[in-house]
């Protein structure tokens, strides 16, 4: 029995050291957190901009596209806008109806973004990078500013990480 425990302990130790070395020395993706977005690309019609951007992909799951839920008349800016940025492998539907209820309570326009690769096939997810998602965050913040004087951001999981990284950049806040 002692021999079995001894070998089990050694195996666990070797595995821990191996995984630790892999985590420290393993390959890492280069992440460019400086990715930005030119807000002038949004133009005067944000709905049209989002439709054109999302039309580039034929495999987006219905209902998870980038979009604005207008508090009142379409195209009318509100004092506050709410932006929802979802988590990894999720979509705008992740915590609904929470963003809708917050926006409704504030009388705010609501912007839903879709991070690159999300709401599509597994292959599309595999091609996305953290830099792509940082650009998506910059685009979403610009869109939220275009439809509201101030922006309330709701984010979950990876969305929260992206917003935290964006908060460190004066050009995005």
Residue ranges with predicted function:
Residues 36-77:
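N-terminal cap/lid segment of alpha/beta-hydrolase-fold proteins
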Residues 61-115:
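Short, surface-exposed "cap/lid" segments of acyl-processing enzymes
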Residues 120-147, 152:
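Catalytic nucleophile-loop/oxyanion-hole region of alpha/beta-hydrolase
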Residues 108, 149-150, 172-173:
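Loop/turn elements at helix/coil->beta-strand transitions in domains of secreted/extracellular proteins
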